[in-house]
Structures are given as C-alpha cells and as structure tokens.
C-alpha cells in the first residue's frame, strides 16, 4: 500500500511516499529556516506563501524519487492541525485535490500524532501501551498512548514549549535562530556552572519554562550591569542541562506511575545531543526501552504524517472532502 504524506503545519513543506506504513520511498523537505531567520521567528503569512510556491513541485519530485506515478497512490494523509491556519490549509487543499482526482481515500492526521508515529518508521516499532514525550517548537506534552488513536494527556507545558524556550534563551544570549541547534552546539564548549531554579507546578507532570527563561534574562542583565563578560557557552550549557533534566524527571515519573517500560521521545528538540545522551543513560539504567527517531525524522516531515495516516486508516479511521484545518486540534480529536 502506497501512502503519500503531506506536512505544511508551520515552516517546513514536506512530502513523503511510504510503502506499507514503514518503508520510506521518498521524504522531501523544503525548509524555510533561512527566510524566517531574518525575522527572528516564523512569519505565518510568509510561511503560507512559500508553501503555495513549492508544494506542487515537491509532490512531483517525491513521486519521481520514489519511482511512482500518481495512479500508484492508495492513500492520502495530510496534517490537519495543530499549526498555522493558513499553512495547514495549503496542505489540506492539495490533499483534497489528490483524493478527488484519484478517487483515493483521505485521512487527516494530528501533527502530534505524526511525531509519535515517526518512531514506527522502522523494523522494530514500539508496542502499546507506551509513554510518549513530544518536545518541539510548539509543543511539550507527556502522553499515555494506549493504542492507535487512543491517547491520554498526562502533562504539558503551562507556557512556552521547550523549543520556544530554546529560541528565546538563544535570543537573550545573542545566538541565531533557530535557537535549539545553536544552544546544543555552543553548550559543548561550556560547563553547566549556573544553578537555574527547578521547575515547580501544581500537577507533577506539567512543566513550565518561564522561570528558567527569566533566570537567564536576569543573569545576563546583571552581568552586563556589572560590566562583566557574558559566558554564553556556560549559560547555554546550564540552561540546556536544567531543561533536559526536568523533561527526563517527568518522563520517568510517568513511566513509574503507569508501570510502563517503553518510552517514545519525538519532536524537533528530541534531536538535541545532550537530551539524547541523558535519556539513553537513564533508560539503560532503569531497564526502559527507549525510542527516539533519527534527527531527520525528529523535525517536521511528511513521512511521519504518512506513517500515522497509514496506521489510522488500517484501524478504520478516515476523513472526507469536508476535512478542515484546525489550528487548535487536540490529540485524539477527529
């Protein structure tokens, strides 16, 4: 079965062809990072315009790379939300057009669902139930995944997502956008010598990054007032360590609470080298089976959408031509 996956929820246009739910035939990504870097963040209007410019050609190129024709497509999967409303509609209209023209089934996919299913793109997928941690530019959530399409949110960010916090702290430190890779890189040259405050929330699996972000801001401000040099690498390493340790602590709280031995981590921040090292260390120590996709599947991509769409369709889920973009789509909402 050939599934085409279309992802346009934010600033990446991506199209993928997948065979039988796990074999990637093509996975093309057109990134807008260099364009949005000028503005220090994603400009929704600009993102939508670029999706319009590149999507049709990207679909053709994905088919060429997979050595497939339009008539070979059996299922069309597309990101329905959450995301930027204009950007989402570009992908959905393309998917609807394909569905109508080819008379093939259509399935709307939650973007977060896609990140979870990025871990199913291989020969040894996770078995249910498992705990999923999604850490990206727009989301930080702990999820109990009981089955395909059956999710329970256990905890989430109360303010910034992890990736957003990385971007804001990078800006405070004078680093380039996007901040995650910049902090990851410069942290290797520093030491975590600053003790940023632990995160405290009323619910044990919720998380908040505003306190750490403010602590970084005040530290930099005070050092400047005193005329001291800003130890950017040390501050970055200290911030990164605190964020990762907080994410790790809550992940293992969730595993212990539900007596589960499988942990799935995905989203753009999951490609952070320190995060990967710490999660692997702790998982080995505690006997937890850990899944983290390769970096190219951590960031937004069409393959994860095709994979999620395939599994949802096999489970009996499907959409129709009334499918709409939903920028606030909840996980599990159909």
From Swiss-Prot:
CDD domains: ASKHA_NBD_TsaD_bac
Catalytic activity: L-threonylcarbamoyladenylate + adenosine(37) in tRNA = N(6)-L-threonylcarbamoyladenosine(37) in tRNA + AMP + H(+)
Gene Ontology MF term list: iron ion binding; N(6)-L-threonylcarbamoyladenine synthase activity
Enzyme Commission number, as recorded: 2.3.1.234
Protein residues bound to substrate: 134-138, 167, 180, 184, 272
Pfam family, one: TsaD
Gene3D superfamilies xrefs: 3.30.420.40
Binding site for Fe cation: 111, 115, 300
Keywords tagged on the record: Acyltransferase, Cytoplasm, Iron, Metal-binding, Transferase, tRNA processing
Keyword Cell inner membrane: no
Cofactor(s) needed: Fe(2+)
InterPro entries in UniProt: ATPase_NBD (IPR043129), Gcp-like_dom (IPR000905), KAE1/TsaD (IPR017861), Peptidase_M22_CS (IPR017860), TsaD (IPR022450)
Superkingdom of this protein's organism: Bacteria
Cystine pairings recorded for this chain: none
Cellular component annotations (GO), alphabetically ordered: cytoplasm
Keyword Transferase: yes
NCBIfam families, A to Z: gcp_kae1, T6A_TsaD_YgjD
Family assignment from sequence similarity: Belongs to the KAE1 / TsaD family.
Function of the molecule: Required for the formation of a threonylcarbamoyl group on adenosine at position 37 (t(6)A37) in tRNAs that read codons beginning with adenine. Is involved in the transfer of the threonylcarbamoyl moiety of threonylcarbamoyl-AMP (TC-AMP) to the N6 group of A37, together with TsaE and TsaB. TsaD likely plays a direct catalytic role in this reaction.
The protein's name: tRNA N6-adenosine threonylcarbamoyltransferase
Originating species: Dictyoglomus turgidum (strain DSM 6724 / Z-1310)
């Amino acid at each position: 079965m050939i599934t085409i996956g279309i992802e346009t929820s934010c600033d990446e246009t991506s199209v993928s062809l997948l065979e039988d739910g796990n074999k990637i035939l093509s996975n093309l990504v057109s990134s807008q990072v260099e364009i949005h870097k000028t503005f220090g963040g994603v400009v929704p209007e600009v993102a939508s315009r670029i999706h319009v410019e590149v999507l049709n050609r990207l679909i053709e190129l994905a088919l060429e790379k997979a050595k497939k024709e339009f008539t070979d497509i059996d299922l069309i999967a597309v990101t329905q939300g959450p995301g930027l409303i204009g950007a989402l509609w570009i992908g959905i209209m393309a998917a609807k057009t394909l569905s109508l023209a080819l008379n093939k089934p259509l399935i709307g996919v939650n973007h977060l669902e896609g990140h979870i299913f990025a871990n199913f793109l291989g020969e040894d997928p996770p078995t249910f139930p498992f705990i999923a941690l999604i850490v990206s530019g727009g989301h930080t959530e702990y999820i109990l995944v009981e089955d395909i399409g059956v999710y329970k949110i256990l905890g989430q960010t109360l303010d910034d997502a992890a990736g957003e916090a990385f971007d804001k702290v990078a800006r405070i430190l004078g680093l380039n956008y996007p901040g995650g890779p910049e902090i990851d890189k410069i942290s290797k040259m520093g030491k975590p010598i600053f003790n940023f405050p632990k995160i405290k929330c009323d619910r044990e699996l919720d998380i908040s990054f505003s306190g750490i972000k403010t602590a970084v801001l005040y530290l930099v401000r005070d050092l400047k007032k005193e005329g001291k040099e800003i130890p950017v690498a040390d501050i970055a390493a200290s911030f990164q360590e605190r964020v990762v340790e907080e994410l790790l602590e809550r992940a293992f709280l969730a595993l212990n609470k539900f007596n589960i031995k499988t942990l799935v981590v995905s989203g753009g921040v999951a490609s952070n080298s320190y995060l990967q090292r710490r999660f692997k260390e702790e998982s080995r120590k505690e006997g937890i089976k850990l899944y983290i996709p390769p970096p190219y599947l951590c960031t937004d991509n069409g393959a994860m959408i095709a994979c999620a769409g395939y599994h949802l369709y096999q489970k009996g889920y499907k959409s129709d031509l009334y499918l709409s973009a939903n920028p606030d789509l909840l996980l599990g909402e159909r």
